[in-house]
């Protein structure tokens, strides 16, 4: 069974940077050693946003973007290696999620698409890459997402305490770690995505630091109720979503009914939308004693305060409190999934994704000989 140093690479729906994490992994433990966040050039970020909102592009443009993202991921890995004074031979493999540009797990031809050419990463780092993690699960009738609950269960499950792990990235997803029950998990809806999109358009800021804008505004209750009427929120699990659905166009359609509103009030309402949709799903799933939050949203003081208020009797904390950096959780998960792939172990949970069976995930791109 492969063990040793692995690197995880994650570029999420929030597009706030490439997260790269170094860890030692074996069948008994996952120990994080180092991490860094690598910036995404504005031009690449905008190109990804355009695709996710349905903008057409030529096959040549698409291929170039795939290559450029692969090179970007390789640069991020090489920067971490240099920082840690490591060589390619010191790393067993890289687990790279890729950049999701479309996720449509239902319909006549279910599919999901993550780009960032793994061949570029393997060639430019000299390290074996495991990627394309989601499509085997979809081929077996699953949603292809979320995949991180398996990792949450391996690291954070408790024999007696009802726990849930909440990742608030661009999309928010929940892992249900309930003793005596199969692991559950699904996407609850928007996490930071709509908040980030709104403040970017209104103030040119990548995100609402310390929720300053949202705290200066007031929740517009009719707008909140209008958004909560979206059928995704009442759809039963298994379910997953992404930027192709909850994007700026989605927000604009709801705002048409509310002309002339204060932008800060919209920001406050979007924060409340995230908090309410998460808390409702926690309660519908039977509640928990401890909700451990990770992802960029765990740094949003308003979101954390609202979750605590909406979930009385639940200890709302961050995964940092149990020794796992909330900023690095997803990248760490894909390093772990790469380890499982090389070990020939399944990486999905049918109780989460709805797949017909467990399966080894991903494709392997060997290092240069």
Swiss-Prot record:
Protein origin, superkingdom = Bacteria
Q: Show the CDD domains listed in the entry.
A: ASKHA_NBD_ANMK (cd24050)
UniProt record, GO biological process:
1,6-anhydro-N-acetyl-beta-muramic acid catabolic process; amino sugar metabolic process; peptidoglycan turnover
For this protein, the record's Gene3D superfamilies field holds: 3.30.420.40
Annotated ATP binding lies at 12-19
Q: Which keywords annotate this record?
A: ATP-binding, Carbohydrate metabolism, Kinase, Nucleotide-binding, Transferase
Q: What is its EC number?
A: 2.7.1.170
At the top of the EC hierarchy, this enzyme's class is transferase
Coiled coil start-end = none
Catalysed reactions, semicolon-separated: 1,6-anhydro-N-acetyl-beta-muramate + ATP + H2O = N-acetyl-D-muramate 6-phosphate + ADP + H(+)
Q: Which pathway does it take part in? A: Amino-sugar metabolism; 1,6-anhydro-N-acetylmuramate degradation; Cell wall biogenesis; peptidoglycan recycling
| Molecular functions per Gene Ontology | ATP binding; kinase activity; phosphotransferase activity, alcohol group as acceptor
Family, as annotated: Belongs to the anhydro-N-acetylmuramic acid kinase family.
What does this gene product do? Catalyzes the specific phosphorylation of 1,6-anhydro-N-acetylmuramic acid (anhMurNAc) with the simultaneous cleavage of the 1,6-anhydro ring, generating MurNAc-6-P. Is required for the utilization of anhMurNAc either imported from the medium or derived from its own cell wall murein, and thus plays a role in cell wall recycling.
Q: Which NCBIfam families match?
A: PRK09585.1-1, PRK09585.1-3, PRK09585.3-2
This protein's name: Anhydro-N-acetylmuramic acid kinase
């Amino acid at each position: 069974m492969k063990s040793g140093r692995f690197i995880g690479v994650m570029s999420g729906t929030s597009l706030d940077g490439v997260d790269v994490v170094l860890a030692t992994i074996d069948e008994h433990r996952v120990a994080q050693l180092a991490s860094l966040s690598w910036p995404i050039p504005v031009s690449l970020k905008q190109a990804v946003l355009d695709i996710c909102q349905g903008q057409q592009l030529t096959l040549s443009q698409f291929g170039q973007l795939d290559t450029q993202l692969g090179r970007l991921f390789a640069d991020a890995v090489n920067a971490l290696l240099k920082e840690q004074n490591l060589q390619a031979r010191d790393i067993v493999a890289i687990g790279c999620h890729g950049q999701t540009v479309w996720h449509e797990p239902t319909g006549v031809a279910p599919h999901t698409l993550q780009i960032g050419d793994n061949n570029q990463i393997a060639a430019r780092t000299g390290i074996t890459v495991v990627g394309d993690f989601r499509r085997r699960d979809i081929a077996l009738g699953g949603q292809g997402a979320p995949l991180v609950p398996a990792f949450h269960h391996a690291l954070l499950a408790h024999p007696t305490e009802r726990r849930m792990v909440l990742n608030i990235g661009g999309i928010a997803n929940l892992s249900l770690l309930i003793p005596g029950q199969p692991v559950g998990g699904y996407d609850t809806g928007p996490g930071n995505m709509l908040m980030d999109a709104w403040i970017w358009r209104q103030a040119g800021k990548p995100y609402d630091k310390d929720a300053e804008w949202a705290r200066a505004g007031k929740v517009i209750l009719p707008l909140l109720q209008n958004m909560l009427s979206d059928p995704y929120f009442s759809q039963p699990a298994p379910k997953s979503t992404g930027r192709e659905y909850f994007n700026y166009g989605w927000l604009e359609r709801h705002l048409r009914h509310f002309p002339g509103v204060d932008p800060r009030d919209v920001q406050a309402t979007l924060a409340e939308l995230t908090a309410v949709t998460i808390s409702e799903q926690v309660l519908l799933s039977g509640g928990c004693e401890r909700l451990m939050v990770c992802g960029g949203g765990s740094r949003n003081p308003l979101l954390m305060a609202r979750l605590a208020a909406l979930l009385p009797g639940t200890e709302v904390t961050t995964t940092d409190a149990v020794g796992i950096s909330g900023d690095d959780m997803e990248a760490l998960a894909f390093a772990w999934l790469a380890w499982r792939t090389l070990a020939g172990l399944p990486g999905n949970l049918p109780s989460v994704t709805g797949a017909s069976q467990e399966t080894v995930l991903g494709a392997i791109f060997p290092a240069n000989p």
